[in-house]
Amino acid sequence: MGHANIWYSHPRRYGQGSRSCRSCSNRHGLIRKYGLNICRQCFREYAHDIGFKKLD
């Protein structure tokens, strides 16, 4: 049994390891509110396209 078979073989059904950004597959800084499931970097990039507006 090599390293490739063991690495990431544990099932990820819940927790931070089970979710990733739908745009870039990043697992850090994930925004899950309203079912967005995108990381904060991608949110800044696509927020205007999604329909979010910056308030003064």
Curated annotation (Swiss-Prot):
Coiled coil: none annotated. Keywords: Cytoplasm, Endoplasmic reticulum, Metal-binding, Ribonucleoprotein, Ribosomal protein, Zinc. Zn(2+) binds at C21, C24, C39, C42. It is found in: Cytoplasm, Cytosol; Cytoplasm; Rough endoplasmic reticulum. Gene3D superfamilies: 30s Ribosomal Protein S14, Chain N. Its cofactor is Zn(2+). GO terms for cellular component: cytosolic small ribosomal subunit; ribosome; rough endoplasmic reticulum. GO terms for molecular function: structural constituent of ribosome; zinc ion binding. The keyword NAD does not apply. Pfam families: Ribosomal_S14. GO terms for biological process: cytoplasmic translation. Binds 1 zinc ion per subunit. InterPro entries: Ribosomal_uS14, Ribosomal_uS14_CS, RIbosomal_uS14_euk_arc, Ribosomal_uS14_sf. Belongs to the universal ribosomal protein uS14 family. Component of the 40S small ribosomal subunit. This is Small ribosomal subunit protein uS14. It comes from Bombyx mori.
